[in-house]
A protein has these predicted regions:
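Internal maturation/activation junctions in enzymes
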Residues: 1-6, 10, 14, 32-109, ...
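Core structural elements
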Residues: 8-30, 181
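Catalytic phosphate/nucleotide-handling subdomain of diverse soluble enzymes
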Residues: 29, 41, 45-53, 117-137, ...
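Catalytic alpha/beta core of large soluble enzyme barrels
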Residues: 79-82, 92-99, 104-248
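Short, flexible, mixed-charge glycine/proline-rich loop motifs
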Residues: 260-268, 279-283
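Short cysteine-rich clusters marking metal-coordination/redox-active sites
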Residues: 273-276, 289-292
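Short Cys/His-rich "knuckle" micro-motifs
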Residues: 282-286, 299
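Short Cys/His-rich micro-motifs in 6-15 aa windows
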Residues: 292-299
C-alpha cells in the first residue's frame, strides 16, 4: 500500500461489521419484509449491534489505546453516539475512548450469501425460483426450476407444491412496494455509522414520475443515498457516437458472423486454434485442435 493508505488505516482504524440474511430471518420469524413489525424488529437489532460494537471498541481502547485521530468531545456530542448507546456504553467510551473511528457498514454480501444459500445484506429475497439450464453434448438441453433455499425448505416442511401457495411473508425484490423497501433501509441507517449497499428493484413499466416519487420518498425518509434498478434495462456506455439500433440480430445471423470471423482467423494463422489458442493439427485435407476439439470442417 501507499504511505497515504497506511497512514489513513493507522489514524482511523476503520472496520465494517455488518449483517447478512435479514430477509431469511424475517421469514423464519413469520414477519413480512417491510411490514411495521419487521421494521420495528430490525430497529431493535440495529441498536443492539451499534451499542455492542461501540462497547467492544471502548474495551479495546482500554487495552490498546484509542485511534490516533480520536477526538473525545466530537464523539460524545455526536447524535449517532448519543442515540445508539446505553448508559453503560457511554460511560466506557467517556473513560477509555474508542479504538475504531468506524464500526458498522452494510455490505452487499452478494457472493458469500449465494454461497451460503441465504439472502444478501438487508435485501429482500430476489426471487422465489428461477430456471436453470444444463447443457449436454447430445440433443436437448435440460431445463429445471430451482427454488431459493428458504422457500424450498418451507415448501418441503409444509407440503406445498406451488410457489403461488406460499404465504405473503415471501415477498421478493420485484413484488415488494418500494416504500416498504425504503422504510427498511431508513431504519437500518439510524444505526450504521458508515454506508449501506442496497438496490431498490422496480418493474420495467415504472414511469419517470414514479422514479421521481421514489427519490422524493427516500429523501423524506432521510436516506443518504439510494440506488434503483428498473427491470429489463440494458446498460450502455456513458458516451456513444451513434444512436444504437433497436434491430436485434437472429441466431443464424450471429452464427454466420462467428463462422466468418473464425475462418478469417484461421486464414491469418492456420496453425493456431481460433477458439482456444492451441495448436492445430492438419490431416486428410482438414485440421483439428487436440486441446478443445475444434475443427473448421464441422462449421
Amino acid at each position: 500500500p501507499l504511505k497515504e493508505q497506511r497512514d489513513t488505516v493507522r489514524d482511523l482504524r476503520q472496520i465494517g461489521l455488518g449483517v447478512m440474511g435479514i430477509a431469511d430471518m424475517l421469514i423464519k420469524l413469520g414477519l413480512k419484509y417491510g411490514s411495521q413489525e419487521s421494521i420495528d424488529f430490525c430497529d431493535k437489532i440495529g441498536f443492539m449491534m451499534a451499542d455492542a460494537s461501540i462497547m467492544q471498541s471502548a474495551l479495546l481502547a482500554k487495552e490498546y489505546g484509542v485511534f490516533p485521530n480520536y477526538k473525545k468531545e466530537c464523539v460524545l456530542k455526536s447524535p449517532y453516539f448519543i442515540k445508539n448507546t446505553t448508559v453503560q456504553t457511554k460511560r466506557l467510551v467517556e473513560e477509555y475512548g474508542l479504538r475504531n473511528s468506524q464500526l458498522l457498514t452494510i455490505a452487499p454480501t452478494g457472493s458469500i450469501s449465494t454461497m451460503l444459500g441465504v439472502s444478501g445484506g438487508i435485501e429482500p429475497i430476489f426471487m422465489i425460483s428461477y430456471t436453470r439450464k444444463t447443457e449436454t453434448l447430445h440433443d436437448g438441453d435440460t431445463y429445471y426450476k430451482v427454488y431459493t433455499p428458504i422457500a424450498k425448505t418451507y415448501m418441503e416442511i409444509n407440503n406445498i407444491d406451488k410457489e403461488e401457495d406460499l404465504p405473503d411473508i415471501f415477498v421478493t425484490a420485484m413484488s415488494l412496494d418500494y416504500k416498504d423497501r425504503i422504510k427498511m433501509q431508513s431504519v437500518w441507517q439510524k444505526h450504521i455509522d458508515a454506508s449501506i449497499s442496497s438496490t431498490v428493484n422496480v418493474p420495467n413499466n415504472f414511469t419517470i414520475e414514479q422514479v421521481e416519487d421514489l427519490y422524493k420518498f427516500a429523501w423524506e425518509n432521510n436516506l443518504k443515498g439510494i440506488t434503483i434498478y428498473r427491470d429489463g434495462c440494458e446498460r450502455t456506455g456513458i458516451l456513444t457516437a451513434n444512436k444504437p439500433s433497436n434491430k436485434k440480430k437472429t441466431v443464424e445471423e450471429l452464427q454466420e458472423e462467428l463462422n466468418e470471423a473464425v475462418l478469417e482467423a484461421l486464414k491469418n494463422n492456420p496453425n493456431e486454434c481460433p477458439m482456444c489458442g492451441g495448436e492445430m493439427f492438419h490431416s486428410g485435407g482438414c485440421s483439428e485442435c487436440h486441446d478443445c476439439g475444434y475443427s473448421p470442417c464441422s462449421i
